[in-house]
């Protein structure tokens, strides 16, 4: 029995040593060092949630992302030390903000738990089927645009394009949409009349274009657009797994709306403001 215990102890020690060897130090600073395991413990849950994929090892991240995570982690530690050295947390203003933050966090947790406990498999399946039926037979287009402030600027860009100007270069030079300008003005794929995408004026003009066709200037609340359609293809039908986030968000919005409405009804909420069309002189 003693011999067996020694074997188990040896194996345990070797496993610990192997684990320590694998847990590399990825950064040092005056306050200490940072190991891979610390980074993974801090960021893995939220990164998995954002990417939808299971990230197992620190090395799974691209090198530039590894550096970003290390800097974020160390900066948080350094700021935590600065906070500890200050008297900021004892001020009345901070305590009030802290209480507000706690209340908001508690409300968010309450709503998240309520939504989670009220989404059934049947609700998910029904909403998924409705979502899929709405996508069947629809077309999606890949669009790019150049956004400018005035119609005069839009006409100038359109003239340059008509004379053989390169759309990508003109987008980079003229577009006010900095999120897309450096990528040739590419917005991505859109579906006609799909909630939460682009404004109707833009969509209607875009879906009337042929592939590689460039629009005349289009006015929206954002300014003037020159639109180009890069590709057209049928909308792919997502699996339940692929559509899960979308369906969960749809159901969450519906459940939340009803929950708040029920709370208002129970509280017998009465708004005492005058009607909008009953103002004096209207």
UniProtKB/Swiss-Prot annotation:
Domain of life: Bacteria
Catalytic activity reported: [protein]-peptidylproline (omega=180) = [protein]-peptidylproline (omega=0)
Top-level EC class: isomerase
Subcellular location: Cell outer membrane
UniProt keyword annotation of Chloroplast present: no
Signal sequence interval, chain numbering: 1-20
Gene Ontology CC terms, in alphabetical order: cell outer membrane
Keyword field: Cell outer membrane, Isomerase, Membrane, Rotamase, Signal
Enzyme nomenclature, EC number: 5.2.1.8
S-S pairs: none
GO molecular function: peptidyl-prolyl cis-trans isomerase activity
Domain PpiC: 138-231
Annotated InterPro entries: PPIase_dom_sf, PPIase_PpiC, PrsA_foldase
Family designation: Belongs to the PpiC/parvulin rotamase family.
Protein name per the record: Parvulin-like PPIase
Organism: Rickettsia typhi (strain ATCC VR-144 / Wilmington)
Highest classification ranks of the organism: Bacteria, Pseudomonadati, Pseudomonadota, Alphaproteobacteria, Rickettsiales
Gene giving rise to this polypeptide: plp
